[in-house]
């Protein structure tokens, strides 16, 4: 028996031209997930669509441009979306539960663990939790951005074995198949490198409008030991075939050395929002990435942003690529004073005795892979 998180996007659950829900697809999804639940699997559905459904009900021809407009549409649409899911699953005798999360819920350690306990209890009670971002109250600077990231964080939170991302394409392609007859579907990706992510963001990969976020989600999931598959959403029955071992869509291999990160490390690496960045020299990059060492002030070349002690920062290599994240022992102002200097100089530079010798201790540091 496995724990499975399935994410369905707006493009799969509604008609883009009218905003109407694709009830045949959603009915098939409800039937598939109900069969899996009755077979003993633990299922979570992460569903987008509240804003789109709200716009359709309000008769809006376009998505609102303002944050307030989107939040108002989500307030209208979320209830309608859950009502639809309750009818579809209810007709099959399968209870569902609504769980709305914000980024703050996963940034705060106590709320993070409480969300985990709530989802576990909903499983124990035999429900299929249906998760969405709480769009009505989420602030623009602290949004997940899309439900791909949310689904990956939830998969890690509950220690799922599988994350299935349902979308409007068959998977990840080597190029745009509409323009390149040589484009091929990639059945497996063994490494989600920063270069691959940059390629997706640069629109050289088919479906890159939403593919970059799916690659990010697969990387987050991999850090938690979760296998990810991207596949076309109009045939939800494929989920059962994927669990049976069939090669459908694009599967992302679990290539992280050392396996699953601890729950705390996953919270540090992916639950928090970075407040700034540290640019490192080559020696520091090697020590942190290859040697698993703490980051010393001597290896910091530059400080980006303003932040306080204990904030999460991104660690940047010489090519400008993020390769790790960690909680800092010093504020940005203090790091500007001690960067590039030896640890024994810290007290004199800051005028305070007994300061930690590390800028980021390895216990509070996560390398990204």
From Swiss-Prot:
| A cellular-component GO term for this protein | cytosol
- Quick one: which residues bind substrate? 48, 135, 147
Enzyme Commission (EC) number: 2.7.2.11
Pfam family of this protein, just one? AA_kinase
Question: What GO biological process terms are annotated to this protein in UniProt?
Answer: L-proline biosynthetic process; proline biosynthetic process
Q: Which UniProt keywords apply?
A: Amino-acid biosynthesis, ATP-binding, Cytoplasm, Kinase, Nucleotide-binding, Proline biosynthesis, Transferase
Keyword Transferase (UniProt): yes
Q: Which GO molecular function entries does the Swiss-Prot or TrEMBL record give?
A: ATP binding; glutamate 5-kinase activity; RNA binding
Top EC class per UniProt? Answer: transferase
- Residues binding ATP are 7, 167-168, 208-214
Subcellular localization: Cytoplasm
In what pathway does it function? Amino-acid biosynthesis; L-proline biosynthesis; L-glutamate 5-semialdehyde from L-glutamate: step 1/2
Q: Which residues form the PUA domain?
A: 275-353
The record's catalysed reaction(s) read: L-glutamate + ATP = L-glutamyl 5-phosphate + ADP
Q: What HAMAP family does UniProt report for this protein, alphabetically? A: ProB
Q: Which protein family is it in?
A: Belongs to the glutamate 5-kinase family.
State its role.
Catalyzes the transfer of a phosphate group to glutamate to form L-glutamate 5-phosphate.
Q: What is this protein called?
A: Glutamate 5-kinase
Q: Which organism is it from?
A: Gloeobacter violaceus (strain ATCC 29082 / PCC 7421)
| Taxon lineage | Bacteria, Bacillati, Cyanobacteriota, Cyanophyceae, Gloeobacterales
The gene for this chain is proB
